[in-house]
Amino acid sequence: MANTVQARKRARQAVKQNEHNSSLRSKLRTSIKAVRKAIEAGDKAAAAKVFAATQSTIDKIADKKIAHKNTAARQKSRLSAAIKAMAA
């Protein structure tokens, strides 16, 4: 239990930050699913368009340290490889 004024404030801030970060992680997962759905549909143009937006989202979340930079790089790499494999 937070006893000091500062500790109570930090506890309030932590709750607020957690909600914000959770919404960003959810947005990230949703955008990744959209890319995978476009890949499964076989529409390379749509997949590339959605991937560009998703790539931006992944980078923003990694910059804010909500997701680790290596995790972000891995996600982008795997999605990019899946899109490139569609042409083959």
Swiss-Prot record:
InterPro entries: Ribosomal_bS20, Ribosomal_bS20_sf
Organism classification: Bacteria, Pseudomonadati, Pseudomonadota, Betaproteobacteria, Burkholderiales
Native organism: Polynucleobacter necessarius subsp. necessarius (strain STIR1)
A biological process from GO: translation
Chain intervals for the UniProt region annotation (Disordered): 1-28
GO molecular function, one term: structural constituent of ribosome
Keywords: Ribonucleoprotein, Ribosomal protein, RNA-binding, rRNA-binding
One Pfam family linked to the record: Ribosomal_S20p
Any Gene Ontology CC annotation: small ribosomal subunit
Protein name per the record: Small ribosomal subunit protein bS20
